[in-house]
């Protein structure tokens, strides 16, 4: 057993471990592992902090986006209301304009009708006077007839024009 290679490898390994332990190698390894564990823990804490910060930024972004969408909807609704109000005002103005134009046209037509009616009456009165004058001249002779015709024609003419 003392002459086998495995025995001497085991003895060398145990001797190596004793030397490492005496020199403080184990404490160096544990301190190295502890510092590595601290560094990993620190990196995990940093990653957790960054993740929370990113989540806060994402929540803020979502909140701002919803606010912007609400504001855009409010702007669109306001613009739609303004457009409807302006269209209604335009229709009202157009209807008022058409009503005024119609009323003015009707007034002009009524005035033209009244003027035409007056002209027709005047023409009818003149024609009636001339016809009456012609008939009376043919049937009546003398100065008295002339005076009677003139008085009657003036009376008829004034009544027809009134």
From Swiss-Prot:
Its membrane topology: Single-pass membrane protein
What are the protein's UniProt keywords?
ATP synthesis, Cell inner membrane, Cell membrane, CF(0), Hydrogen ion transport, Ion transport, Membrane, Transmembrane, Transmembrane helix, Transport
Residue pairs linked by disulfide bridges in the UniProt entry: none
One GO cellular component term: plasma membrane
Q: Which GO terms describe its molecular function?
A: proton-transporting ATP synthase activity, rotational mechanism; proton-transporting ATPase activity, rotational mechanism
Q: Where in the cell is it found?
A: Cell inner membrane
Q: Which InterPro entries match?
A: ATP_synth_b/b'su_bac/chlpt, ATP_synthase_B_chain
- Where are the bilayer-spanning segments? 1-21
Subunit structure of this chain's protein: F-type ATPases have 2 components, F(1) - the catalytic core - and F(0) - the membrane proton channel. F(1) has five subunits: alpha(3), beta(3), gamma(1), delta(1), epsilon(1). F(0) has three main subunits: a(1), b(2) and c(10-14). The alpha and beta chains form an alternating ring which encloses part of the gamma chain. F(1) is attached to F(0) by a central stalk formed by the gamma and epsilon chains, while a peripheral stalk is formed by the delta and b chains.
> Which PANTHER family does the UniProt record give?
ATP SYNTHASE SUBUNIT B, ATP SYNTHASE SUBUNIT B', CHLOROPLASTIC
Query: Family per UniProt?
Result: Belongs to the ATPase B chain family.
Q: Provide the function of this protein.
A: F(1)F(0) ATP synthase produces ATP from ADP in the presence of a proton or sodium gradient. F-type ATPases consist of two structural domains, F(1) containing the extramembraneous catalytic core and F(0) containing the membrane proton channel, linked together by a central stalk and a peripheral stalk. During catalysis, ATP synthesis in the catalytic domain of F(1) is coupled via a rotary mechanism of the central stalk subunits to proton translocation.
* Name of the protein this chain belongs to: ATP synthase subunit b 1
Q: Which organism is it from?
A: Methylorubrum populi (strain ATCC BAA-705 / NCIMB 13946 / BJ001) (Methylobacterium populi)
């Amino acid at each position: 057993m003392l002459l086998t290679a495995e025995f001497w490898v085991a003895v060398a390994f145990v001797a190596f471990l004793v030397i490492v332990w005496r020199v403080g190698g184990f404490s160096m390894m544990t301190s190295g592992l502890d510092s590595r564990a601290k560094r990993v823990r620190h990196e995990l804490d940093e990653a957790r902090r960054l993740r929370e910060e990113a989540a806060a930024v994402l929540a803020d972004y979502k909140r701002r986006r919803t606010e912007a969408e609400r504001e855009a909807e409010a702007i669109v609704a306001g613009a739609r209301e303004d457009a409807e109000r302006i269209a209604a005002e335009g229709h009202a103005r157009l209807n008022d304009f058409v009503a005024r134009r119609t009323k003015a046209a009707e007034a002009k037509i009524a005035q033209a009708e009244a003027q035409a009616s007056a002209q027709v009456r005047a023409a009818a009165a003149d024609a009636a006077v001339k016809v009456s004058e012609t008939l009376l001249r043919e049937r009546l002779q003398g100065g008295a007839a002339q005076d009677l015709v003139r008085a009657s024609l003036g009376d008829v003419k004034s009544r027809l024009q009134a």
